[in-house]
Amino acid sequence: MKQPRLLPALLLALLMLLPAGCGTQTTGAPQQTPTPTETATVSGAAGTLRVQVPDGWKYELCPAGSLTVSDQAFGVKIWPDSGSDSCVQLYWSDSFGVCGTGLKEKSLTLAGDTASAGYYDGSKNWTFLSYQGKNRGIVAWANPNAPWFAAQGEQVLAVLDTVEWEPAA
């Protein structure tokens, strides 16, 4: 008598466990990058910096003297429209240096050239990217603990891959 009830009970248990296997998985697959809709352009004595800002993201142009990095630094602050005041500062500077304590660096290819990504104290998220080669002098600085950074880090890299640097003649 108990056998006819066992099959429906097993099927019901299986159906209840099935949705548990359908959750979001974190894989190495990149997130879909928003389509760039606007080019942010800022110029200074050293040249012109351009970057594509995706739809749904905000930016602020920062002329020379408006960043705390140096009087000559100029660039663009970029952030997703997430309600956070934390941003990525993308800028040109005549000098760039960081503290080496707890720093691990990895080499990336961005905007057709090499960039050095700096990770502090075992963080999975980078704190800075320093462009080399044709884009030397361009730096991206971020707060790796910003609430949106971990979820949208791939999108940030896609944005930073659109950097164009035109040195002054």
Residue map of PLM features:
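C-terminal motif of bacterial Sec signal peptides marking the signal peptidase cleavage site
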Residues: 18-21
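Bacterial signal peptide processing site
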Residues: 23-25
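Secretory pathway targeting signatures of secreted, lumenal, and periplasmic proteins
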Residues: 43-97, 120-129
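N-terminal low-complexity, Pro/Thr/Ser-rich intrinsically disordered segments
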Residues: 28-49
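Bacterial N-terminal signal peptides that target proteins for export
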Residues: 1-10
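Hydrophobic helical h-region of N-terminal Sec-dependent signal peptides
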Residues: 10-16
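Signature of long, low-cysteine stretches enriched in small and polar/charged residues
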Residues: 95-151, 157, 168-169
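Short, hydrophobic/aromatic-rich segments at coil-to-beta transitions
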Residues: 35-41, 72-76, 109-118
